[in-house]
Amino acid sequence: MFALLMMLFASFVGLSGALLVWPGADRPQHVDAVLSLNGPDEHFREQRALALVRDGYARVLLFSEGHYPEVPCPKVPHVVVVCFVPKPARTVGEIEFAARYAARHRWHTIMVVPGHTQTARARLLLARCFQGRAVVVPAAAPPLLELPYQVAYEWGALVKALIVDPGC
């Protein structure tokens, strides 16, 4: 019994690492817009999204203000910045907003900047909600001391997205 529990624990740790701690990242590409998701590590996401639009990967930045509106809507020369409050104020609301906005503007590609541990859930929701091609470029990893909380939170959010509240 102990061996089985240890094997299950090791599998859980390995899966957590693969999905949440070291998520697969796409290479930045030229796209119709960059979507910056909101969350507790907002400054990492904002910095990454701003760097991508400043480097010319897109001329439009969709900036979610969600639960953390203390981060002001950024201003970027020669870039259209669309700040929005998603409804619902969760990742699914952000992805749904971006999908509707993209359809309205006939966009085919978006680059999404999720929180590092949020990458797997962002990919899941993009596959459900966005009809075009999505490039996922996660923000920098959170500080090591925040990682256990973020991994635990993300497991709950991922289960919710899979089972309880699938969205789109």
Residue ranges with predicted function:
Residues 150-168:
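Short hydrophobic helices that act as membrane-entry/anchoring signals
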